[in-house]
């Protein structure tokens, strides 16, 4: 059985107040002066004080083995802030730190360890505030308004580096080879790790480590680094430094899922919902010039226009990619929304998913068997449901304590307003009819004979994504649904959490004293007309799931208040994020893929054409991380996702899976 919880660090604090690992019998940092040692070994060993002002790119990438207390990261962040203050006009604008940690500290232990360095408190407090729950995989933290990105990879570094997507190859400018001493933790210091470090290092990239062990020096040399010894810190005689002076040949493990970015920094986004809003912010943060074309007269008039939407992860015992993506997407979304400098109605009141029949009870039992962190999800017995939700249901279930609800329409509008303040250009009532390549750009033809030319285009227009020749064969489908808006009652006013059953019910929004109840489901439909049948069906599903609950019977839908929208979905319930695949070229190039994997070319795609679609009913959960993934891909930056999970988001995945098995592929 796959477990989705990471074991925390087993440590104690010695007489000097230094954290010590019980498992490895080693200190996390020097009792003498850990801060100065970090500055000497890692910042000095990689010559960062000299390299920062001379760096020719806007982003500097550092990777580290063993995050521990975060001392190396915090020290580097402090130094980077000092550099930016002293060199405001420098080419280098942002710092990206990637670290691997098998046994992460708890938030409490992290805060206790940070008390050692009062001068780092301004940075340490920001790290503590966003410290992620112990889930495997990558946790992206956006710090200092996005100027500093921290990717925390929880798990074994030798496993995680082998699971990296090829897009991370040759991205690392400097390596901090840290961790417990080789004699204490020999499982980490392997040739596989040294080879991975070399593969990920940019030509000209450097490394530094506190150890001078001969097998470490020889292993790094064998991997491709040019190594030298340097005087060690304090009483330590020697340490090691290295540089990648050659350009190593790069492996391509799965070319059919290869992702390509763009050297250009100008893009048009087509759409008007939450995907467009969040992607605009992510691209603007990376220095892109962004223009948005919305077919409607205002934003959030499509699937993103609801008054209340639930935020919680989609989990399944039988789908590892689904679990890995949605658990990390959910935790990223909470961190993202919490630091977003815009106002929107929301309440992180928790979400409880109830087992209202035998099938749903079995599904919940399977989810609970996955050893999930209690911060993510916990079981709740029937007699406790009323206490935590405020209403009686006579059902047990699973509760997501960090879930809740938010107003998607308000979020989308206000994020777009923020993006406009940062340079986003928006054109409303621009209905894209078709697009074509012209002189290494995309020519966009809109209704009313309007035209525009852009270097890069992102299609993020929901269920209308397949209306163009380049996307007409995508395996996506429309789902029309109606959400009912119901006035509160004395009993409903007691509801403290979002309830999920064969539908969902939100607590009242204090702004309007209404609840949302929904939603109907009509696959293949794009009908947005009000339906009295759907209105009654939303009420009846609630009653059918909780037949003994008097409060459910008193739900009133007679005022016909509702909102109808159309979602875009996929068969496997995962979004489609990445390059727009070329269907015809894919069939030609991969006609013999099942027999000739070793000869496969890179995935056929349309140059500089991307898509962000098929968010289904979990867009509030998935959109923030998907926006970050796509913006990173487009900008040729590290992507916060392992290769196999990232492949599960690739727009060509459903075709390629069949082709890998030698099966026929049909359009749509």
From Swiss-Prot:
Alphabetical list of SUPFAM superfamilies matching this protein: FAD/NAD(P)-binding domain (SSF51905)
Keywords: Cytoplasm, FAD, Flavoprotein, Methyltransferase, Multifunctional enzyme, Oxidoreductase, S-adenosyl-L-methionine, Transferase, tRNA processing
InterPro entries: FAD-dep_OxRdtase, FAD/NAD-bd_sf, MnmC-like_methylTransf, SAM-dependent_MTases_sf, tRNA_MAMT_biosynth_bifunc_MnmC, tRNA_MNMC2, tRNA_S-uridine_synth_MnmC_C
Region (tRNA (mnm(5)s(2)U34)-methyltransferase): 1-245
Known cofactor(s): FAD
GO terms under cellular component: cytoplasm
Record function comment: Catalyzes the last two steps in the biosynthesis of 5-methylaminomethyl-2-thiouridine (mnm(5)s(2)U) at the wobble position (U34) in tRNA. Catalyzes the FAD-dependent demodification of cmnm(5)s(2)U34 to nm(5)s(2)U34, followed by the transfer of a methyl group from S-adenosyl-L-methionine to nm(5)s(2)U34, to form mnm(5)s(2)U34.
Family classification: In the N-terminal section; belongs to the methyltransferase superfamily. tRNA (mnm(5)s(2)U34)-methyltransferase family.
Name of the protein: tRNA 5-methylaminomethyl-2-thiouridine biosynthesis bifunctional protein MnmC
